[in-house]
Each structure stands twice: as C-alpha cells, then as structure tokens.
Amino acid sequence: MSAWTHRHILDLSTFSREDYAAVLELAHRFSAMPVTGARRLPALQGRLVATLFFEPSTRTRSSFELAAKRLSADVSSFSPSSSSLSKGESLLDTARTYVAMGADVLVVRHRCTGVPRQLAEALERTGERTVVLNGGDGLHSHPSQGLLDLYTLAQHFNPSHPLPEALRGRRIVIVGDVLHSRVARSNLWALTACGADVILCGPPSLVPEAFAQFVAQPPPGQASDPVADRGALTVVRNLDDALAGADAVMTLRLQKERMRQHMLTSLDRYHRDFGLSHERLQVCQVPIPVLHPGPVNRGVEMSGALLDDLSANRVEDQVRNGIPIRMALLYLMAAAESPLSL
C-alpha cells in the first residue's frame, strides 16, 4: 500500500489512482471482519472521533460511528438542537470545543459548501493536530459516499480483487438530479480517475450540459489533476440510449428540498422518462447492477419492485460497504500505528 499523504479528506478531486487503491484495498481487508468473527480491532484505541453533523443523516452518521467503534475509537456525537449553537456559539467555536476535548478526527457535515475546508484551514492556522473528514457539504462533495460507491462497483466486477483496475473501460450511467448532488460530483471524480467512462442522463434542468466538462480542469485553487488519463464524461438526454451498452447504472434522489419551484413539472412524468424499473432495464440485454445512494423516493427514481429486488440492485451492499470504507478512511487519517490482524 502506497504512503498516505492526505492530512484532511475534503474532496476526491485531489485523489490519485494510488489513493483510491489504498482505500479500497484496506476496505477489502476490513470487510472480512464479520466473516472471521473479529468485531473490533485495537487500531484506534485511545483515539477520539467526533461526528459534527449540522444536517440530518441516518446512513452516513451511523456508518462513521460504527466504523470508529470497530476500530476501538471513542466516539462523541454532536447534535445542533442540544448544543450551544442555539445559544449563539459559532460553528468554529463548537469545533474548537471538540479539539480541546482531544478529538483526533472531526467528521463534519453541513448544508453549506466549504464548511469542512474552512474548519480544516482554521485548525491548520493554529497548529492543531486534529484532522477533518468531510461528511458531505452543500452541493460540493461527499467523499466517503463516492468511495463506497466505487468499492461497491469494483466488488461487483471483481469480487476477489475489488480495486480501481476493475473499473477501467467500464461504462457507468448516472441518472437523475446531478445538479443538486454532492454524491454525483464525488462519483465523477472517483469513477473517471479509475478509467470508467461516465454517461450523465436527465433533463437539462437537472443535468446541465456544462457537466460534460466537470473533470476537464482541476477545481479552483488546485494546481493540477493528480490523474493524467481520466475516463470520458458525456451527457445523454434519452435514458434508453444511455443504458444501451452500460455496465452499471446509478440513479440519484430528486432533492426537492434544494430545488427552485417548477424545476420539474410532474413526478409521474419524471419516472416515465428517467425512472428505473425491470422493464426499463431490459434495454441493457444483460443484467447490470443498479445503485442508489439513498434515501430513495420509491416509485420516482426507481420502481418499488426494482427497489425490493435485492438480486437486481446493490442498495444494501452500498450501505454495508459504507462501514469498511469509513474504517479505512479513519484508519488512514488517524495514522494508527497498531498492526492490522484481520
């Protein structure tokens, strides 16, 4: 495994192919824990992981906390409704409170883009050793979700060796609300870095044509792209055309809470044009894995029958894989010195 160089994890645009391989390899080793019966490792014993979630979350928060506990870390969970934020305390002061209590890792989720980066930069300026892991910020990024989706696909294509090479040359369709999705943005960086060609599909209001250039240049403030030869990224409007020849498809939740009024005329029409079902997938000619980062609007992004068919979709695998992926990230970030014995 190559040396880990990321002090904070804020965005997958900074990841090299070797970084993806390091995370997936470690996650694959951690995923063997339930099989061997070993429920905990002493790797992060004595470390404190604090989950600072300023947005509601079920899967991500629970997954991070379970991951930390399986590595024997102590966990402190922050809730805005019962915190001093309601008394006027700033977000930075809240974070510093956890740093003062000895937090080694802050997992931060916030509705505003850039908050995890701002906290990381503030801690760097004062020389704190605490590191920040982005648990999802605004429309910007959701690194751990992008990584677990990548791992789920690699696991499907090569169960015994689920590494980035399993994605090279694959055709992956992402359909739905790309505009409002931090998950989609993280997946675009991850999938193209591993050599997959990505086809985006949806109405122009949710998949602007400009997304075809999303990975063409590094983000502002980043000098260069750590991946020299990314996969292709294209936008296709017709879902049947997009699915023809696809190796996998991911459908995204319609984030109605982030939409302006009248962005969609009808949910029924959306499902008819862009929803997934057993019937729609027949255009693929061969079975392909169906992913969804959750939560699912049943009967909108995916038919109820397809969602209930665990042989056709990988939704539960995504949830399951969140734990070893987040264990890998916490282990790498905390620079644990305990040897692994899986």
From Swiss-Prot:
One Gene Ontology cellular component term attached to this UniProt record is: cytosol
Residues involved in L-aspartate binding: K87, R182, R253
Keywords assigned by UniProt, alphabetized = Pyrimidine biosynthesis, Transferase
PROSITE patterns linked: CARBAMOYLTRANSFERASE (PS00097)
What stretch or stretches form a coiled coil here?
none
Record-level GO BP terms: 'de novo' pyrimidine nucleobase biosynthetic process; 'de novo' UMP biosynthetic process; amino acid metabolic process
So what does this thing catalyse? carbamoyl phosphate + L-aspartate = N-carbamoyl-L-aspartate + phosphate + H(+)
Listed GO MF terms? amino acid binding; aspartate carbamoyltransferase activity
| Entry's EC annotation | 2.1.3.2
Which chain regions cross the lipid bilayer?
Answer: none
Chain residues that bind carbamoyl phosphate: R59, T60, R109, H142, Q145, G294, P295
Pathway assigned in UniProt:
Pyrimidine metabolism; UMP biosynthesis via de novo pathway; (S)-dihydroorotate from bicarbonate: step 2/3
UniProt-listed InterPro entries: Asp/Orn_carbamoyltranf_P-bd, Asp/Orn_carbamoylTrfase, Asp/Orn_carbamoylTrfase_sf, Asp_carbamoyltransf, Asp_carbamoyltransf_Asp/Orn-bd
Its assembly, as annotated, is: Heterododecamer (2C3:3R2) of six catalytic PyrB chains organized as two trimers (C3), and six regulatory PyrI chains organized as three dimers (R2).
What family does this belong to? Belongs to the aspartate/ornithine carbamoyltransferase superfamily. ATCase family.
Describe its function: Catalyzes the condensation of carbamoyl phosphate and aspartate to form carbamoyl aspartate and inorganic phosphate, the committed step in the de novo pyrimidine nucleotide biosynthesis pathway.
Identification of the protein by name: Aspartate carbamoyltransferase catalytic subunit
Taxonomic lineage is: Bacteria, Bacillati, Cyanobacteriota, Cyanophyceae, Synechococcales
